[in-house]
Amino acid sequence: MADFLGMMKQAAQLQSKMKAMQAELDQIEVEGLSGGGLVKIRMSAKMEVRGVSIDPSLLKADEGEVLEDLLVAALADAHRKAEAAMQEKMQALTGGLGLPPGLGLG
């Protein structure tokens, strides 16, 4: 019975820490780049796009396809960085709990 109560207490603590971590993830901002910085996408670690910056040289009619490709690449870069930031926070949160690798709590 004491083990069960201990697990319940640990679960409540984990839930509280998860809420705090979600707030932290909202504050972390990463920037995805492509085209040597011609396209930039800002994103929170919660995968919310916060802004897009496009160099004016890409806004010409004949640059549409290039711009599309650079937007996709910048978004992918931002997504990778946001995912890495989230994984780092999750590892810090769950590192001492002995959870199996890859257990998605986020």
From Swiss-Prot:
GO MF: DNA binding
Entry keyword annotation includes DNA-binding: yes
UniProtKB keywords: Cytoplasm, DNA-binding
Domain of life: Bacteria
A Pfam family recorded for this sequence: YbaB_DNA_bd
UniProt record similarity statement: Belongs to the YbaB/EbfC family.
Organism name: Rhodopseudomonas palustris (strain HaA2)
Location in the cell: Cytoplasm, Nucleoid
One CC-aspect GO term: cytosol
Alphabetized InterPro entries for the sequence: YbaB-like_sf (IPR036894), YbaB/EbfC (IPR004401)
Record bears the keyword Iron: no
Function of the molecule: Binds to DNA and alters its conformation. May be involved in regulation of gene expression, nucleoid organization and DNA protection.
Name by which UniProt lists this protein: Nucleoid-associated protein RPB_0667
SUPFAM superfamilies: YbaB-like (SSF82607)
Transmembrane segments: none
Subunit annotation: Homodimer.
